[in-house]
Amino acid sequence: MSGLNNLGYFAGILDGEGSFFLETNKKEKRYIYIYPVISCEMTDFDVIQSLKKFFKVGHITKFEPRKKHYKISWRWRVRGGKAIDILKLCIKYFSIRRKEKANILIEHWKNRRDNVV
């Protein structure tokens, strides 16, 4: 099976290169919204582009080098329920540490109350 059509391939990329975390977003000075986020940043644009194409979701952002000898990097990012959907698909391929982190985010999302604190 081709890597570009294989869930295990992309789960491996996220396991090794990705970040999973909760992001806060303050709105109207009264509420703090909390969202699960999946992010993967690297200099290989083709890999970042293939993540977006495979999962059919997310945004790609370009980052210019901060120093002359650095390369341009690209970040693919998904948040909210779509991030949870991806975690649920990929969790069986993750390492133990990543499974634990994914389960924390999934539980948070499941137990949220309109996602507002």
Where is each model-derived feature located?
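Internal intein/HINT superfamily modules and their associated LAGLIDADG
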Residues: 1-117
